[in-house]
A protein has these predicted regions:
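Short beta-rich binding modules
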Residues: 1-190
């Protein structure tokens, strides 16, 4: 039987939130949810809306490697979902503009093309400049970071970012088999 000794392990760490207003370069990862075209969207628990489930990793500065998350509603069955989808579309447009160096007022054909994607998977891995906010504690949960504002090229705080080559094509990863790998029963429990 294996033995694991954690007596010399560090005690757990508690992270404070990244201060509100922090400007940082972040990389967005879309966490596929097996809903919507290509499986990139996540369906809500009640099944009435679909959203992009996104993780943001800070790439530079004192908070490098720290993460925060956001859902972008893209479809739903209520007027509230429609309004949320409109807000999300504006934020996603700003993410494309920040990451691709497009000023929001640019109406050129190149700018219009830069705001188009073939799949939500095209957003996966996109790097852009963000202002990080803080959601106050609620419902027994501690305060957490959120994407407060996307900094676009028309703003003083914006700077060019380097996009890494896409790691995967514009399709969601294959869904894992529904049957998990067999876990062998330990000898002591027989």
């Amino acid at each position: 039987m294996n033995s694991y000794d954690f007596n010399d392990a560090d005690t757990q760490r508690k992270f404070a939130v990244i201060p509100a207003g922090t400007i940082a370069t972040v990389r967005m990862t879309v966490r596929p949810g097996s809903a919507g075209e290509g499986g990139w969207l996540r369906r809500s628990n009640d099944g009435n809306s679909e959203a992009l489930d996104c993780e943001f990793v800070v790439l530079n500065g004192p908070f490098a490697k720290r993460k925060f998350w956001s859902l972008f509603t893209v479809a739903g069955s209520t007027q509230g979902h429609a309004e949320a989808a409109k807000i999300s579309a504006g934020m996603l447009r700003a993410i494309l503009e920040s990451g691709r160096g497009i000023k929001p007022v640019d109406k050129s054909d190149a700018a219009k093309e830069g705001r188009r994607i073939k799949s939500y998977g095209d957003l996966n891995g996109l790097t852009f400049v963000a202002r990080i906010g803080v959601e106050p504690p609620q419902n027994g949960y501690e305060a957490k970071n959120r994407l407060d504002h996307v900094v676009t090229p028309d703003e003083k705080a914006w700077h060019p970012v380097t996009q890494e080559p896409a790691a995967a094509p514009s399709a969601a990863p294959a869904k894992p088999p529904s049957t998990p790998a067999k876990i062998n029963r330990p000898d002591w429990s027989k």
